[in-house]
Amino acid sequence: MPAVRDQAVPVAEISVSEIGHIEAIFRYPVKSMAGDRVEAADLGWHGIDGDRRLALRRTRERGGFPFLTAGKLPDLLRFVPLGPEGGAPGDLPARVRTPEGHEMEVFGEELAAEIERRHRAPVQMMHLRDGIFDQASISVITTDTIEEIGRLAGVDPDVRRFRPNILVRLLRPESFQEDRWVGGVLSFGEPGEGPRVNVTMRDERCAMVTFDPESGRSAPAVLKAIVRRNQNHAGIYGTVIRTGRLAIGQTVRLHELAEA
């Protein structure tokens, strides 16, 4: 486990309240592929150890965002990265299982060819030491928000649609409570000892939430429900200001800060 380190937040705390506990922790070794649900994980400056450290680069892309995501190839969500046998948590995956059950080396030509066949354009697996993230290195959502979206959309409230790093179960159930966390700090575990995340922005959603993680089929009602209910936001993004160990069951506290 890495030593706990801090980055100071340059404003004073005005209140601290216990809001819930960690219900689940996820990491996604390959961007847009299936994730791992883990019991515990080290949280470093660039997010959860092993999270989104690999991504498929579109080799013909010369401008903009070069990496292939499920927004362009929904089938990616059904590819499952497999860790090395006997490997440590956070190790890069050694193989990937396709939706049809075939296992291929993660950096091998066979996997690249399989993705190319589906995407109809060449790709290359890349290792990015600090990870590749859309907005920030940590995302958090609550069980209440997911359940409310499922109710409004008439679909199973599957957390995997939302691809969070941390799923929180609140002490006082309330959907979309995450919106009020922006500008504050979340801490995890024992007071003064566990990791901390500065909540920087609401998580604006895209078509990826519509895709069923098992079948890949689209349910547009999911995104429509988020748009109608909460201006297309569900969950939050944050940056790490104190590293440490995350574990299921840890207490989650919200530190509200005075305005700078």
Question: At which residue positions do the language-model features occur?
Answer:
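Metal-cofactor-dependent catalytic cores
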Residues: 2-260
